[in-house]
């Protein structure tokens, strides 16, 4: 699905034009209202700077938190406007509301190269309902549209889909274009062997991905809390480890499917057990057939790490989604950190394409200080999963075809 991108527009298309850009500025704040991680803001800078440098008037639309269709003073974009001003080295004004006469007057008064941030679009319930009247009001700010919010591209909302009915051209920004290139490319035309590492606590949240990847991958490695549902389905004792009792048949089916399709499905052979869910818990390493009593598995074990590393060394494209254990606790972060280091090394020294597919695995890679070493780090959690599942993203489908 090839979409028109911002790179196809030059100064003749952009000079003096008001461009509505949907960005993903849903960043974490601490209790003092300060941004603790500005990755998403920095990710949008190339698109914004391209528009500034081509003399466009830039109008940014973003959501923040879940204000449930009402103004919530704690969810205003004030800290975002301040951080963006610092990163761009120019003032970014913030409107009091994303629609209305006052906001439109502000967008109409912009000079070429100016940047205006519209207040939180989710202060209006119509945003998430994809209300076309609301979309029309948002669109009235601008002459054309750029979607650079991959993290929200799986939502059919007014600012991601509705506005494209009223603005032309509607194109992909650089971040969205890069996400599609890597994630879609890894699924449609990867360098092989292709491996996926799927982690996280629940099979239920990764069913679609695992199912879809079984049709695409040469190898799949599974880690995280979800492994215990597979073990229990095999009839093993898992102690007090997390298990989704209603997904045991599904786990059996996935193993059978992998076998039938000739996909190498690797599950850990040993795990790190804890006597309680705590960073200071007593821990021990155990083979998967020796778990019992009050122990719970919180990480993959050292033997499994080696097996996974050897399997990954043979691959040319690797997608990673979900941690191997409770990496927030240092004691149970070894599996996740080892995978992160392995991928960074393969990326750097073996020209392997490494894609970190959103969510907790991104946090783990950043915590390990290895983000720069990966081929691609996805900014979208749900959007990455849906793309890997082979679903069409509404925010992408709505853009003009190339």
From Swiss-Prot:
It is an enzyme of class 2 (transferase). One of its GO terms (molecular function) is phosphoglycerate kinase activity. Its EC number is 2.7.2.3. Substrate binds at residues 24-26, 40, 63-66, 122, 155. Keywords: ATP-binding, Cytoplasm, Glycolysis, Kinase, Nucleotide-binding, Transferase. GO terms for cellular component: cytosol. It is found in: Cytoplasm. ATP binds at residues 206, 297, 328, 358-361. GO terms for biological process: gluconeogenesis; glycolytic process. The keyword Mitochondrion does not apply. CDD domains: Phosphoglycerate_kinase. It catalyses: (2R)-3-phosphoglycerate + ATP = (2R)-3-phospho-glyceroyl phosphate + ADP. Monomer. Belongs to the phosphoglycerate kinase family. This is Phosphoglycerate kinase.
């Amino acid at each position: 699905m090839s979409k028109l991108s911002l790179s196809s527009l030059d100064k003749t298309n952009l000079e003096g034009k008001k461009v509505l850009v949907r960005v993903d500025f849903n960043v974490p704040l601490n209790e003092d209202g300060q941004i603790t991680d500005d990755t998403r803001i920095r990710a949008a800078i190339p698109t914004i700077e391209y528009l500034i440098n081509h003399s466009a008037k830039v109008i940014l639309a973003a959501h923040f938190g879940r204000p449930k269709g009402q103004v919530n003073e704690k969810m205003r974009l004030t800290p975002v406007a301040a951080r963006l001003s610092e990163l761009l080295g120019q003032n970014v004004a913030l409107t009091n509301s994303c629609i209305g006469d006052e906001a439109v007057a502000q967008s109409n008064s912009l000079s070429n190269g100016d940047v205006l941030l519209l207040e939180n679009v989710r202060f209006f319930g119509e945003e998430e309902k994809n209300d076309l009247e609301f979309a029309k009001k948002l669109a009235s700010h601008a002459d054309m549209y750029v979607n650079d919010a991959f993290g929200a591209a799986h939502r059919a909302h007014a600012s991601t889909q509705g506005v494209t009915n009223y603005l032309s051209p509607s194109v992909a920004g650089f971040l969205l274009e890069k996400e599609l290139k890597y994630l879609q490319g890894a699924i449609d035309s990867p360098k092989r062997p292709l491996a996926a590492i799927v982690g996280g606590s629940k099979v239920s949240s990764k069913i679609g991905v695992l199912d879809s990847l079984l049709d695409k991958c040469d190898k799949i490695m599974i880690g995280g809390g979800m492994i215990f549902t597979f073990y229990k389905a095999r009839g093993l004792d898992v102690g007090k480890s997390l298990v989704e009792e209603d997904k045991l048949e599904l786990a059996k089916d996935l193993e059978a499917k992998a076998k039938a399709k000739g996909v190498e499905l690797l599950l850990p052979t040993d795990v790190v057990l804890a006597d309680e869910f705590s960073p200071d818990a007593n821990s021990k390493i155990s083979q998967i057939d020796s778990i019992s009593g009050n122990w719970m598995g919180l990480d993959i074990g050292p033997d499994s790490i080696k097996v996974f590393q050897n399997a990954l060394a043979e691959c040319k494209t690797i997608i990673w989604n979900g941690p191997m254990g409770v990496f927030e606790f240092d004691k149970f972060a070894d599996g996740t950190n080892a995978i992160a280091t392995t991928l960074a090394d393969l990326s750097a020294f073996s020209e392997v394409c490494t894609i970190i597919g959103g969510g907790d695995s991104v946090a783990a890679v950043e915590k390990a200080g290895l983000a720069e070493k990966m081929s691609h780090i996805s900014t979208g959690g749900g959007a990455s999963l849906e793309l890997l599942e082979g679903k069409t993203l509404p925010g992408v489908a709505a853009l003009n075809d190339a």
